[in-house]
């Protein structure tokens, strides 16, 4: 038989040329496979299952367990089929046809079981254990070993999330190879030698990897277990439901295991085109936010005394309807970036149909009008499942996928830190660097751990200088060695420029990114941080866009949408964005706010946002759990979590990621928890407005009927760079981004996950630290107009008079505590002990 290889992200199958094939015989069956194929893989293609423990298709071969040994004609002894490649004319006999191979496999199994404990009745792996299964299928009924089994103290916590039972380990090295090869975190190793060999960590070196949970899942025995799941359930007691991760924009496939209406664990699903078989720990363990005791289960309304009290759904909906009707045309809608496509579409339609406004925005973060223009021109309506050419006239690319990103010869990251903001993208970049030497360049203040693990090159950029850097890369003029290499690499076929949401804070940054893409021929892709942002664009949850990427000010676009929605026309006025909605509400220009899943601390100016909520005459909050918004709302309506509802996420590729409800709507809360779209439908009915979105199927059908906009696109972003701040001695320009594990609300409820957060540290260059009178390890005070953030200092190679802070980590609420945003000037100096006078910093 001739084997074909498929292109994972589309494009159909490509036949392997005959000169690249070798033909061999396995158990009497002839097969032709590409050169370099392992014997164990060739056997799989014939349907022959060879037992194994150390082998994994996404890890480099190790031959550690020896369970997969087969007989190869011409060889003096059996060989490990996971380490030998197929050669032309090779004849292989597996345990099915070779007594030699069968006896050898029995011997290996007997050896592995000598010290393995009889823990199966209590082991978390029992019922889904490869060792258990293969001991039955390829082992013997008795053992010649009669001595006392070796035991160790158990379990050993190698992190707050991962527990190690050393006596169960079969030394397959899957966990160590994953950590070293895939994640780039060689924090666990096989230590000692011979009979003393075991998995362990270095002294005082905890297993602080964002991907540690994958080692639990790929462990073929119960040696590594989850601290949060240990002894909680048995595999055969669980109901498994396929799902999609709701955290970042990667769209990772997951498997949700639940029991008696409660999610017990979440695993990575096998999705070769997206996350392969890996997910980050945030996606694996970050699901308990929906199981907290403060979960909202019933509507709340504010009574005459100003207190929120429980109410029935009809009562709450009627009060909300009256308040919104009284403010029609003067209501702002803030949806946040975590909604499904269907829910975001419902908000978009509700804003236009029920509230008669284009004042709607999903961007609960730093944003700009330039970004809105960029999204309309280069993102909306483009992507893997949305159409659009793979290369636009401006050089941007709508066809960038995980696979094309992995195959790219060079990648430039701008305003984007892959490991912290899209871990699945980071794993592909690291894999590409390891496998074919992909060149990664990053415009950033310092080389992050993720950049170093991807073999990347830092192009040091102070906040605001990204525009200058991009223009220099486009022209190829005025660059030093690293920049020259990047400019040349970006001109190679298939190169990619990745821009993150943080580039919106740099005036002219996105405009320059488009110019650089056009000048170099590199494809341009935008990767946001949150799961719902890409879908919100297509749903029209922006002041400038209607569903399908239609410009809100285009007459034909409005006519198309109005006709489908049964309206004479839609609002004409260009709507307000998030910042403008907040400001208008704070000034009393808006009378009501409809807020969905937005946390005040995430907004660019939390203080002004609180003022907006206080000044707005009427606030309706759709929420899972109490928040600063719900505490100030007049009506609070509870909604379903991701595990409780079906829906769709659109990942950064533009790939549609459908998922069904893992739980029935009332299983988690014991009360009805409707989707956001269902709540809006009931609210529209109470307002006597026809929304026409009674269920998911109807909503999806309506979105499909609208389709993507085929008319003229919105104009290109045209923004020039602004003047850069000039810090004096004792001052610095603030830089920062959010870490993957921080103070986010969707991470609450899992103490084990919180235990592996990276410590929050401030960063300064050596020269700036000396100028400010601090040294490595000292507590640095970063002071803004609202107050100060105090963190331990880590002296780092980075531009002078720039200070980097994690934006939402413990003790580092930059916007809330200091009242500043990246790109602004702050004062820096040693933290002042309580009761002491502040030090003067000499100019």
Swiss-Prot record:
Residues at which [2Fe-2S] cluster binds: 54, 65, 68, 82
Residues in 4Fe-4S His(Cys)3-ligated-type domain copies: 100-139
Enzyme Commission number, as recorded: 7.1.1.-
SMART domains from the UniProt entry: Molybdop_Fe4S4, NADH-G_4Fe-4S_3
GO cellular component: membrane
Domain 2Fe-2S ferredoxin-type: 20-98
SUPFAM superfamilies for this protein: 2Fe-2S ferredoxin-like, 4Fe-4S ferredoxins, ADC-like, Formate dehydrogenase/DMSO reductase, domains 1-3
Cofactor notes: Binds 1 [2Fe-2S] cluster per subunit. Binds 3 [4Fe-4S] clusters per subunit.
Binding site for [4Fe-4S] cluster 3: 245, 248, 252, 280
Enzymatic class: translocase
Listed Gene3D superfamilies: 3.10.20.740, 3.30.70.20, 3.40.50.740, ADC-like domains, Dimethylsulfoxide Reductase, domain 2
GO terms (BP aspect): ATP synthesis coupled electron transport; respiratory electron transport chain
Residues that hold [4Fe-4S] cluster 2 according to the record: 169, 172, 175, 219
Positions contributing to [4Fe-4S] cluster 1 binding: 116, 120, 123, 129
Chain ranges passing through the membrane: none
Domain of life: Bacteria
Gene Ontology MF term list: 2 iron, 2 sulfur cluster binding; 4 iron, 4 sulfur cluster binding; metal ion binding; molybdopterin cofactor binding; NADH dehydrogenase (ubiquinone) activity; quinone binding
Cofactor needs: [2Fe-2S] cluster; [4Fe-4S] cluster
Keywords associated with the record: 2Fe-2S, 4Fe-4S, Iron, Iron-sulfur, Metal-binding, NAD, Quinone, Translocase
Catalysed transformations (reactions): a quinone + NADH + 5 H(+)(in) = a quinol + NAD(+) + 4 H(+)(out)
Pfam families referenced in this protein's UniProt entry, alphabetically: Fer2_4, Fer4_NDSU1, Fer4_Nqo3, Molybdopterin, Molydop_binding, NADH-G_4Fe-4S_3
Domain named 4Fe-4S Mo/W bis-MGD-type: residues: 238-294
Free-text function comment from the UniProt entry: NDH-1 shuttles electrons from NADH, via FMN and iron-sulfur (Fe-S) centers, to quinones in the respiratory chain. Couples the redox reaction to proton translocation (for every two electrons transferred, four hydrogen ions are translocated across the cytoplasmic membrane), and thus conserves the redox energy in a proton gradient.
Family: Belongs to the complex I 75 kDa subunit family.
NCBIfam families: NuoG (TIGR01973), PRK07860.1 (NF005895)
Entry protein name: NADH-quinone oxidoreductase subunit G
């Amino acid at each position: 038989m001739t084997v074909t290889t498929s292109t994972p992200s589309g494009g159909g199958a490509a036949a392997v040329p005959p000169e690249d094939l070798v033909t061999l015989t396995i158990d009497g069956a002839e097969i032709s496979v590409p050169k370099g194929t392992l014997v164990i893989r060739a056997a799989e293609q014939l349907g022959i299952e060879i037992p194994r423990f150390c082998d994994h298709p996404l890890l480099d071969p190790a031959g550690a367990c020896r369970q997969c040994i087969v007989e190869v004609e011409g060889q003096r002894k059996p060989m490990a089929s996971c380490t030998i490649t197929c050669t032309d004319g090779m004849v292989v006999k597996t345990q099915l046809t070779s007594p030699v191979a069968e006896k050898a496999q029995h011997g290996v199994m007997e050896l592995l079981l000598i010290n393995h404990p009889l823990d199966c009745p209590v082991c978390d792996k029992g019922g889904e254990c490869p060792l258990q299964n293969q001991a039955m299928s390829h082992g013997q009924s008795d053992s010649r070993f009669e001595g006392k089994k070796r035991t160790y103290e158990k379990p050993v916590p190698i992190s707050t999330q991962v527990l190690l039972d050393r006596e169960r380990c079969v030394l397959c090295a899957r966990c160590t190879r994953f950590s070293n090869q895939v994640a780039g975190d060689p924090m666990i190793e096989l230590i000692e030698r011979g009979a003393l060999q075991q998995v362990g960590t270095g002294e005082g070196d905890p297993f602080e990897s964002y991907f540690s949970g994958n080692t639990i899942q790929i462990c073929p025995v119960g040696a590594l277990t989850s601290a949060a799941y240990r002894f909680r359930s048995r595999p055969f007691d669980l109901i498994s439901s396929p799902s999609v991760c709701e955290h970042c924009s990667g769209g990772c496939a997951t498997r949700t295991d639940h029991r008696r209406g409660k999610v017990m664990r979440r695993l990575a699903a096998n999705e070769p085109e997206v996350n392969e078989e890996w997910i980050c720990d945030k996606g694996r363990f970050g699901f308990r936010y929906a199981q907290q005791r403060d979960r909202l289960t019933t509507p709340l309304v504010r009574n005459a005394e100003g207190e929120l009290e429980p109410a029935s759904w009809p009562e709450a909906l009627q009060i909300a309807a009256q308040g919104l009707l009284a403010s029609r045309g003067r209501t702002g809608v803030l949806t946040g970036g975590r909604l499904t496509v269907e829910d975001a579409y419902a908000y978009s339609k509700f804003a236009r149909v029920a509230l008669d406004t284009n004042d709607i925005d999903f961007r609960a973060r730093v944003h700009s009008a330039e970004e809105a223009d960029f999204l309309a021109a280069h993102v909306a309506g483009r992507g893997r499942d949305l159409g659009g050419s793979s290369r636009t006239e401006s050089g941007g690319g709508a066809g960038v996928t995980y696979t094309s990103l992995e195959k790219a010869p060079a990648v430039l990251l701008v305003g984007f830190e892959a490991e912290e903001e899209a871990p699945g993208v980071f794993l592909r970049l690291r894999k590409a660097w390891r496998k074919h030497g992909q060149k990664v360049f990053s415009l950033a203040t310092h080389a992050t751990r993720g950049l170093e693990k991807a073999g990347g090159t830092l192009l040091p950029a102070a906040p605001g200088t990204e525009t200058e850097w991009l223009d220099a890369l486009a022209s190829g003029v005025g660059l030093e060695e690293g920049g020259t290499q990047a400019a040349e690499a970006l001109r190679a076929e298939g190169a990619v420029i990745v821009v993150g949401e943080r580039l919106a804070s740099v005036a002219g940054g996105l405009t320059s990114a488009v110019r650089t893409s056009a000048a170099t021929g590199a494809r341009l892709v935008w990767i946001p941080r949150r799961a719902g942002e890409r879908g919100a664009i297509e749903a029209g949850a922006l002041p400038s866009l209607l569903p399908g990427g239609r410009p809100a000010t285009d007459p034909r676009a409005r006519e198309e949408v109005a006709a489908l929605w049964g309206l004479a026309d839609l609002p004409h006025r260009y709507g307000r964005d998030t910042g403008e909605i907040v400001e208008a509400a704070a000034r009393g220009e808006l009378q009501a706010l409809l807020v969905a899943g937005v946390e005040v601390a995430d907004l660019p100016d939390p203080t002004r946002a609180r003022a907006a909520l206080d000044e707005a005459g009427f606030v309706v909050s759709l929420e899972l759990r109490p928040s600063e918004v719900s505490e100030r709302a007049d009506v609070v309506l509870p909604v379903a979590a991701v595990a409780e509802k079906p829906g769709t996420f659109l990942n950064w590729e533009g790939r549609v990621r459908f998922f069904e409800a893992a739980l029935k709507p009332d299983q988690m809360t014991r009360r009805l928890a409707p989707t956001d779209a269902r709540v809006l439908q009931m609210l529209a009915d109470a307002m006597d407005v026809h929304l026409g979105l009674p269920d998911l199927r109807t909503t999806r059908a309506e979105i499909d009927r609208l389709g993507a906009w085929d008319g003229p696109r919105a104009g290109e972003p045209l923004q020039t760079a602004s003047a850069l701040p000039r810090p004096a001695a004792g001052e610095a320009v603030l830089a920062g981004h959010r870490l993957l594990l921080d103070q986010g609300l969707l991470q609450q409820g899992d103490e084990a996950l919180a235990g592996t957060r990276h410590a929050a540290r401030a960063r300064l260059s050596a020269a700036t630290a000396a100028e400010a009178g601090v040294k490595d390890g000292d507590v640095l005070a970063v002071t803004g107009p609202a107050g100060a953030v105090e963190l331990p200092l880590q002296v780092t190679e980075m531009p002078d008079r720039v200070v980097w802070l994690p934006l939402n980590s413990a003790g580092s609420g930059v916007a809330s505590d200091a009242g500043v945003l990246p790109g602004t000037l702050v004062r820096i100096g040693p933290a002042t002990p309580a009761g002491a006078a502040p030090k003067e910093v000499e100019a």
